[in-house]
Amino acid sequence: MKLEGIYSALLTPFSEDESIDRQAIGALVDFQVRLGIDGVYVGGSSGEAMLQSLDERADYLSDVAAAASGRLTLIAHVGTIATRDALRLSQHAAKSGYQAISAIPPFYYDFSRPEVMAHYRELADVSALPLIVYNFPARTSGFTLPELVELLSHPNIIGIKHTSSDMFQLERIRHAVPDAIVYNGYDEMCLAGFAMGAQGAIGTTYNFMGDLFVALRDCAAAGRIEEARRLQAMANRVIQVLIKVGVMPGSKALLGIMGLPGGPSRRPFRKVEEADLAALREAVAPVLAWRESTSRKSM
């Protein structure tokens, strides 16, 4: 089973009433396949999972797996505050045909380090699927290198989703545990992550620019660094506008610009305005031109 590679942190399409648009899931998953990415990471931050009930999250895991129908590698994010809820989602992911699970640390309460470590050990012990630890210090308690090394010593913990700008720590993880899979988590630092040893990347903007990041990965692997830097800069121009607009609603708006259903984000995320759409269209135009040029060359 190949778990390395480029994964979109799959968005969740909503209808105008903020219910999950189940009719749109197939089109979104089909687009991920056409982008040529390796898989999808379902139910994470980009999917607005923390704005959903457990039943909604479980249903979405099932719907995405059915739509993918074996065409993509599937990683289910099952992270929650409560260990029992993460275990429930983990069991559901296994039944739905996922290849791995991932989990952010328990948050909101000031859990002790032993409590956080015990949470992961129990999840890894019980899960029928391999576990990828989600290291996201900007949103939850981060991990020290010794803590990550300890977690990765568990036979069912196979990797780290490193959503951090700390490239020193990323490289030290790769050095300390060479067999672990390390996924870069910040899209705007994808090339840096690969340069420091990441074997994969999981990102929000891969939902609509996954083909660009596949090309970036291939250029980096082939030593074509200037070309990879050019692709990273092209992506970063889009990301810079997304940060101003709001990454979640802006990303869904970009799906709409590309003719795909995304819908709004759930409140309290704001609605995208016309001025935002104009800025997003301008920013993504070079990516669309690159895609068209690349498509012509491959014909």
From Swiss-Prot:
A GO biological process this protein is involved in? Answer: N-acetylneuraminate catabolic process
Q: Say yes or no: keyword Cytoplasm present.
A: yes
Q: List the subcellular locations.
A: Cytoplasm
> Which pathway does this polypeptide act in?
Amino-sugar metabolism; N-acetylneuraminate degradation; D-fructose 6-phosphate from N-acetylneuraminate: step 1/5
> Which residues are catalytic?
134 (proton donor), 161 (schiff-base intermediate with substrate)
Show the GO cellular component annotation of the record: cytosol
Q: Which UniProt keywords apply?
A: Carbohydrate metabolism, Cytoplasm, Lyase, Plasmid, Schiff base
Q: Where does aceneuramate bind?
A: 45-46, 163, 185, 187-188
Could you list the residue ranges that cross the membrane? none
| E.C. no | 4.1.3.3
Q: What is the top EC class of this enzyme, as a single word?
A: lyase
Pfam families in UniProt: DHDPS (PF00701)
Catalysed reactions listed for this entry: aceneuramate = aldehydo-N-acetyl-D-mannosamine + pyruvate
Q: Name one GO molecular function term.
A: N-acetylneuraminate lyase activity
Q: Which PROSITE patterns match?
A: DHDPS_2 (PS00666)
Function of this protein?
Catalyzes the reversible aldol cleavage of N-acetylneuraminic acid (sialic acid; Neu5Ac) to form pyruvate and N-acetylmannosamine (ManNAc) via a Schiff base intermediate.
Relate the assembly described in the record: Homotetramer.
Q: Which family does it belong to?
A: Belongs to the DapA family. NanA subfamily.
Quote the NCBIfam families the UniProt record gives. Answer: PRK04147.1
User: What's the protein called, per UniProt?
Assistant: N-acetylneuraminate lyase
Organism expressing this protein natively: Rhizobium meliloti (strain 1021)
Query: Could you read off the lineage of the organism from its UniProt record?
Result: Bacteria, Pseudomonadati, Pseudomonadota, Alphaproteobacteria, Hyphomicrobiales
